[in-house]
Regions:
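Residue(s) in the substrate-gating loop at a strand-loop-helix junction
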Residues: 148
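Substrate-binding pocket helix/loop in short-chain dehydrogenase/reductase
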Residues: 101-103, 110-112
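C-terminal helical subdomain
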Residues: 184, 188-189, 204-225
Length: 225
């Protein structure tokens, strides 16, 4: 059910970590929020928490989505518009980390899995958001891509993740120019290490550029939200 005058946000990777924190913050701010992710159960948990904290149950929708599948992403945005009428904000957040071990031992499939989610998936979501925001009335919206500090400071044995995050920066900069014609603002956040499952190993120590193993500080994911 569309709530009168409420804005609508789509949050990918919305079942855990940074995505969940952002989804809950948006729900608290009065948004209608669609959370997308690979598994339905964590999405349902995010929706339930939004209801418990903010009474936002009718403003929440969880849609299991593989962002590396263009057809699934198209369906995500179609269902969002069907339920809430429009899309005002995309937090383009879904991502995955590197395969384990040295890149010398990675298979082509392991490389592609990272690229398919971190880069291709981000493009598919951005593309569908653009199409939706271009065609709706009033036109326009905002897209925030979740980049990474790895786009600025790579670590050893992180070539898949680091390469995709550098590519995301280029995607963001170009999309920001392309969005002007449609009143679509595109930006990017490059946070440090948030306390999520993906970054949990940072607290145990990870390889540094100088060859040392060092513990890296973590921030609460809620700070991002």
């Amino acid at each position: 059910m569309e709530m009168k005058n409420a804005k609508t946000a789509v949050v990918t990777g919305g079942g855990t970590g940074v995505g969940k924190a952002v989804a809950l913050a948006l729900a608290g701010a009065g948004y209608q929020v669609v959370v997308a992710g690979r598994r339905q159960a964590p999405l349902d948990e995010t929706c339930a928490e939004a209801q418990a904290k903010y009474g936002a149950g009718e403003r929440m929708l969880g849609i299991a989505t593989d962002v590396s599948d263009p057809a699934a992403v198209e369906q995500l945005f179609a269902r969002t518009v069907q339920r809430f009428g429009r899309v005002d904000l995309l937090f383009n957040n879904a991502g995955r980390g590197n395969p384990p071990g040295s890149f010398l031992d990675w298979t082509p499939e392991q490389w592609r899995e990272v690229v398919d989610v971190n880069l291709n998936g981000m493009f598919y979501c951005l593309q569908q958001a653009f199409r939706t925001m271009r065609d709706q009335s009033p036109r326009g919206g905002r897209i925030i891509n979740n980049g990474s500090i790895s786009a600025h400071a790579p670590r050893p044995n992180s070539s898949a993740y680091t390469a995709t995050k550098h590519a995301v920066m280029g995607l963001t900069k170009t999309a920001a120019l392309d969005g002007r014609a449609y009143d679509i603002a595109v930006g990017q956040i490059d946070i440090g290490n948030a306390m999520t499952e993906l970054a949990s190993r940072m607290a145990k120590g990870v390889p540094q550029a100088n060859g040392e193993i060092a513990v890296e500080p973590l921030i609460d994911a809620d700070v991002v939200g």
